[in-house]
Amino acid sequence: YLDAPEVPAGGGGLVSSPKDYDRFLRMLLGYGRIDGKFVMSEEAVRVGVSDLIPATVDLTGSWLEGEGHGAGGRSKGSTFGWGGAAGTLAAVDFDLNLRSCLWTQYMPSEAYPIRDEFIAAMEADLADMRAMKKAA
């Protein structure tokens, strides 16, 4: 982390703690507001987590097939999230007002199936929770 990256990227080389990461997710769920203050505009959050890929782009066969892509993360329905280095995952669901994280420390992140298993379990739980909310 002492050397500048060849290509500047918003998430490239970021180092954080689970506490700070969760705070960031809380801010997203608050549409830019945390601890009673706006640290980001609501519009910036809404645009950043929305699907920014034009409908004319064919995603067939790509890693984004069936999903959208916001500013640095995947957008699927009311859920927005992304994966990081060393196997980490983070997501927020705006309809259910939930946030979730997976913290691991191994590289490459594909070395173990835990990310895929976590995503599958999370999506199943979210589907159940949406169904319960709809039925209520």
Question: Where are the predicted features?
Answer:
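Catalytic loop of the DD-peptidase/beta-lactamase superfamily, centered on the K-T-G motif
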Residues: 1-136
